[in-house]
């Protein structure tokens, strides 16, 4: 398993991309849920947290059934066999961890900071870039680390989506090795 570094590279790549997707989504979902009055914001929070209630195997089967009938535009392989689907399922499964980290830190930031910047003429993008993101950096980093570290050991969903050994993450490779006579 450790003689071939492709598994480690895949794991680092997949989990890094998934954790980055998680913190970006978690930042915006947290902001929408905690700072806006949009109708349905609680539903958005519940949908984002629902990944904890759905087993990974069920999610993997759902992704296979959904994306197997669509082909990639540059070849005739099904969309479900593309390595980025593993990244997407890792991001979906770990989004609640990043979301709770972002919620916790955003609840501690006073709304008055945003309101005072807005009253001084700052745009929303400037408020995000210069006030919210620097103040939330600890929560974003905690969400990234939690999402990344828990995604590295995810097996139940990825086992359904790995189509070739060259796309497999380390957890899948360890599982495959344990199924051989040498791994027992």
Model regions and ranges:
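Membrane-embedded alpha-helices of multi-pass transport/permease systems
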Residues: 24-28, 61, 85, 92-114, ...
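Transmembrane alpha-helices
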Residues: 50, 54, 92, 99-102, ...
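Generic alpha-helical transmembrane segments of integral inner-membrane proteins
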Residues: 12, 16, 20-28, 54, ...
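Transmembrane-helix boundary motif in ABC transporter permease subunits
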Residues: 17-48, 111-113, 124-131
């Amino acid at each position: 398993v450790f003689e071939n570094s492709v598994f480690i590279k895949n794991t680092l790549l997949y989990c890094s991309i998934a954790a980055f997707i998680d913190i970006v989504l978690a930042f915006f979902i947290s902001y929408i849920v905690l700072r806006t009055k949009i109708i349905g914001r609680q539903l958005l929070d519940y949908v984002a947290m629902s990944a904890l209630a759905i087993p990974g195997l069920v999610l993997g089967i759902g992704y296979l059934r959904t994306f197997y009938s669509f082909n990639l535009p540059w070849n005739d392989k099904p969309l479900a066999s593309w390595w980025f689907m593993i990244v997407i399922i890792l991001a979906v499964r770990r989004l609640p961890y990043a979301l709770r980290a972002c919620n916790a830190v955003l609840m501690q930031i006073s709304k008055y900071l945003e309101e005072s910047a807005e009253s001084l003429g700052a745009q929303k993008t400037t408020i995000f870039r210069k006030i919210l993101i620097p103040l939330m950096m600890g929560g974003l980093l905690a969400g990234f680390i939690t999402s990344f570290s828990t995604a590295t050991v995810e097996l139940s969903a990825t086992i359904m989506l790995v189509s070739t050994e060259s796309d497999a993450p380390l957890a899948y490779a360890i599982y495959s090795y344990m199924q051989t006579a040498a791994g027992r």
